[in-house]
Amino acid sequence: TAWEGYEKIPSWIMEGYGTMASEAAEQLREAAINRPSHVFVQAGVGSLAGAVVGYFANLYPDNPPTFVVMEATNAACLYKGAVAADGEPRIVTGDMPTIMAGLCCGEPNTLGWDILRNHVTAFVACPDWVAARGMRILGAPEKGDPRVISGESGAVGAGLISTLMTDDSYAELRDLIGLDKTSNVLMFSTEGDTDPEHYRKVVWDGAYPAE
């Protein structure tokens, strides 16, 4: 992460993540999608999220996509900063149990936070079952869709989108971000089955069912 006085190396890391956003934009153009309506991106300290949001906010300055940032509930430092609504980052301390190990970070990158607080429409704190749902959906998609082997931190976007679109108890958030069946959503799977045994427990055995 970054903090005051330590920003150079974190900025290089964010530049690297920006390459991923650039490659995604190129793939969208090849698929004749001029602009995604929404960009869903997960966050730990916010380096990846800041790079992705910053890239697409600059790519579409006059009509940017709706940005949604997802965190693990027990490590949702960016969400807490957004709720505080004073522009200052917040730090989560103590135990942060979650299956989304890659998102288990309690101190935000100040460089990323500065981008995110100015461009993100919704910060969402996601419980583990949302990530597990995404893993199962991507691992066993509907006919015609490609299979994606995605780990816990990578699949949370698919789980959240599916939940928002199928569970009317989240209609307020769905309406807030303008998500509907006409949306073109860009999301990023940032890991595979880094723990194959746990992946099987979730995808095959149904661990962490929806609550």
Task: Map each language-model feature to its residues.
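Active-site-adjacent helical/loop segments in soluble small-molecule enzymes
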Residues: 3, 14, 107-177
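Glycine-rich phosphate/pyrophosphate-binding loop at beta-loop-alpha junctions
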Residues: 3-118, 173-211
